[in-house]
Amino acid sequence: MSELDAREIIEMIAKAKKKTPIVAYIKGDLAGIDFSSFKFFGDERFGILFGEYEDFKKLLEEHREKIEDYHLEVKARNSALPLADLTKYKARIEPGAIIRDMVEIGEGAVIMMGAVINVGAVIGEGTMIDMNAVVGGRAIIGKKCHIGAGAVIAGVIEPPSAKPVVIEDEVLVGANAVILEGVTVGKGAVVAAGAVVTKDVPPYTVVAGVPARVIKQIDEKTKEKTKIVDELRNLE
């Protein structure tokens, strides 16, 4: 998948038919009711419907006397873009991760519980996005990186002129660190936990603080402490 331009994404969102997907569980005299607007599973007494809220609202109004009870689950409201089809990725994606459509995830990547990845983002092969990390729209993360729990990689869809975050290969971003719009983090760098990165990070350096600054070059001790564990990326 090629890198998405911000204006392309904005145009897609603006022109997309907004959807309010629902799952409805209904009980009653269902014989003779037209469920063609939904994906329907059930019989003449009980059914499960997958479809749009407005269609269900209309169904209720037309057949109120036949429907004895129902339970409604609303998955989103006026949503412009769907979530990704997770089956297309050769990656480990844990329950509770939220991944929008048009996200590229490389083979062997790991997306942990609660991680959020927005439209147009690119996640490289073997990279781990840890729990509750946020990868914003159009952010580009290289291969064999680790994005720590609670970290925020800023997105740049609005304003459309902004440059996306680029994190090169083999970078470790500590827990709760923030990488701001337009920043490039060089290959092999380490961003300390809690750091706020406002400018480019040179390759093979360690940055820390608010705002982040270079505190040292990568040495053997740092390499050992920040080593990527390949076994965690095994899909078999």
UniProtKB/Swiss-Prot annotation:
Alphabetically, the GO molecular function entries are:
tetrahydrodipicolinate N-acetyltransferase activity
State the source organism's domain of life: Bacteria
One GO biological process this protein is involved in is: lysine biosynthetic process via diaminopimelate
Q: Which InterPro entries match?
A: DapH, DapH_N, Hexapep, Hexapep_transf_CS, Trans_hexapeptide_repeat, Trimer_LpxA-like_sf
Query: In this entry, which stretches build a coiled coil?
Result: none
Q: Which UniProt keywords apply?
A: Acyltransferase, Amino-acid biosynthesis, Diaminopimelate biosynthesis, Lysine biosynthesis, Repeat, Transferase
What is the reaction catalyzed?
(S)-2,3,4,5-tetrahydrodipicolinate + acetyl-CoA + H2O = L-2-acetamido-6-oxoheptanedioate + CoA
- Role of this protein: Catalyzes the transfer of an acetyl group from acetyl-CoA to tetrahydrodipicolinate.
Q: What is this protein called?
A: 2,3,4,5-tetrahydropyridine-2,6-dicarboxylate N-acetyltransferase
- Which organism is the protein's source? Thermotoga maritima (strain ATCC 43589 / DSM 3109 / JCM 10099 / NBRC 100826 / MSB8)
Protein encoded by which gene: dapH
